Amino acid sequence: MRVRKRKGAQEHLENNPHYVILEPEAAKGRWCEVFGNDHPIHIEVGSGKGAFITGMALKNPEINYIGIDIQLSVLSYALDKVLASQAPNVRLLRVDGSSLTNYFDAGEVDMMYLNFSDPWPKSRHEKRRLTYKSFLDTYKQILPENGEIHFKTDNRGLFEYSLASFSQYGMTLKQVWLDLHASDYQGNVMTEYEARFAKKGQIIYRLEATF
């Protein structure tokens, strides 16, 4: 979902270089220096307005989190949440999910989150889906052996597509939830969209898969 252009968004990001990594290519292989520790790194591709990545960072101070989104205005709203939280273990990148190998070394990322990604429902747009095989190729390069992807969506079509895509790629489906909010799963941190969908009673699907 597109967010209305936010005035001053670019300046907002540029004025906060501690949290927004403006030259991420230079951080490749050096993320431990960026964070000042060697804690595990988890990334969220398509981080939206930052509720999930900020919530996770506050909940798990022993893990470093990186929120990634290509939309300028969206990332500026995520920065608002990061600044308000003052979480020391979160950073933001404005880059495309298809280019992650430009910013992370092999095995440098320990876990990935894909939350409420654009479903791109038309067949001609299949290659844009973040669970398409070319994206999985990219993710595999930056994750360690048995690296994990945690995926959430309200879109049944995208969920079924992703189940098939992960399986066809040879990934292992560790756990699958067909109605996350009706399950006994503990520790769920919601995105902005998820909270909105939950109020409407929409079903949320979730899975965990490993390479």
From Swiss-Prot:
Residues 124-129 are annotated as: Interaction with RNA. NCBIfam families: PRK00121.2-2, tRNA (guanosine(46)-N7)-methyltransferase TrmB. Keywords: Methyltransferase, S-adenosyl-L-methionine, Transferase, tRNA processing. Substrate binds at K122, D154, T191, E192, Y193, E194. HAMAP family: tRNA_methyltr_TrmB (MF_01057). Its EC number is 2.1.1.33. The keyword Mitochondrion does not apply. InterPro entries: SAM-dependent_MTases_sf (IPR029063), tRNA_(Gua-N-7)_MeTrfase_Trmb (IPR003358), tRNA_methyltr_TrmB_bact (IPR055361). The keyword S-adenosyl-L-methionine applies. The active site is at D118. This is tRNA (guanine-N(7)-)-methyltransferase. Catalyzes the formation of N(7)-methylguanine at position 46 (m7G46) in tRNA. It comes from the Bacteria. GO terms for molecular function: tRNA (guanine(46)-N7)-methyltransferase activity. Pfam families: Methyltransf_4. S-adenosyl-L-methionine binds at E44, D69, D96, D118. GO terms for cellular component: tRNA methyltransferase complex. Pathway: tRNA modification; N(7)-methylguanine-tRNA biosynthesis. Belongs to the class I-like SAM-binding methyltransferase superfamily. TrmB family. It catalyses: guanosine(46) in tRNA + S-adenosyl-L-methionine = N(7)-methylguanosine(46) in tRNA + S-adenosyl-L-homocysteine.
